[in-house]
Amino acid sequence: MLDELKCEACSIDAIALTTQQQQELLLELEGWHLMEREGIPQLEKVYKFKNFMQAWQFSNQVAELAEQEFHHPSILLEWGKVTVTWWSHSIKGLHKNDFICAAKCDQIIR
């Protein structure tokens, strides 16, 4: 299971996942989708909540996860929802770390 793995150091010379590898790992996640922004592949999910406070608390938990894994997403906090987007900045693409952290985000709300 992805949520049981730890992120590894991802240097600028790390190799980004192929499209096939991304698709295979995506099968292990629920509700996440692959997208591209400014030519950079990214992994994104929108989480829904009953109010702003719940969304804010979840955002803080994702921030704590990011610090623990030393891998940081884009987090968009809005009333009743949080959009989390993972990608590996150093390689301008997707790494297994992104899928590990996505799985750990899902674990937060279970």
From Swiss-Prot:
Keyword Ribosomal protein recorded: no
InterPro entries assigned to the protein according to its UniProt record, in alphabetical order: PCD_sf (IPR036428), Pterin-4-alpha-carb_dehyd (IPR050376), Pterin_deHydtase (IPR001533)
tRNA processing listed as a keyword: no
CDD domains xref list: PCD_DCoH_subfamily_a
Keywords: Lyase
MF GO annotations: 4-alpha-hydroxytetrahydrobiopterin dehydratase activity
A Pfam family this chain is assigned to: Pterin_4a
SUPFAM superfamilies with a match to the protein in the record: PCD-like
Catalytic activity: (4aS,6R)-4a-hydroxy-L-erythro-5,6,7,8-tetrahydrobiopterin = (6R)-L-erythro-6,7-dihydrobiopterin + H2O
GO biological process: tetrahydrobiopterin biosynthetic process
HAMAP family assigned: Pterin_4_alpha
Family (UniProt): Belongs to the pterin-4-alpha-carbinolamine dehydratase family.
Name this protein carries in UniProt: Putative pterin-4-alpha-carbinolamine dehydratase
Species this protein is from: Vibrio vulnificus (strain YJ016)
